[in-house]
Amino acid sequence: MENSDDFIVITVSGPDAPGIVSSITSILSENAVKIIDIEQIVIRKLILLSMMLDLRESKGGQISLLKDLLLEAKRLNVELDFKIASYDEHLQHDNNFMYAVTCLGEKITAQVVAQISNAIYSENVNIERITQLSQGELSCIEMIVKTDKTINVQDMTGKLLSISSDFGVDIAVQKENIFRRSKRLVVMDMDS
């Protein structure tokens, strides 16, 4: 049986600067902490870094580690928050089905995002991550969604079809896996 304090999730947020990830992970390394999951994003010079940590083989204990992390966060001028996680939360991450919902169009407005996210929510599916994939004249966003049950991709695409026609955007739904990004199709019109 795992102890209830063997896993923690830390979240670092604040003004971005070089060395934040290096400083935080150096402390984790010195304490022999295993990183189970990690995600970082910087938006307009604001960093958000989250990690799920396995402390089962760490040195020094949870209190000492958290003290070191909080002091380093203060020195770096960022906020550090933590949550004690359970072993079950760690296992649940692996027992979910992931899908990618991609939206492409001239303009992807808040109304488009609201309609897509409402359709996803109506299926009791959670949006895990939203990423902008493009810059410039054409907009493209990708939502990685997670559910504890498999969904019918054709049914979900059908629900999103009305949004597609109402707002002049293209929406695709596909399973999220390692092979998804390697599929590419290039069409060249040589007649002109």
Question: What are the roles of these predicted feature ranges?
Answer:
Residues R184-S192:
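Asp-based phosphoryl-transfer active-site loop
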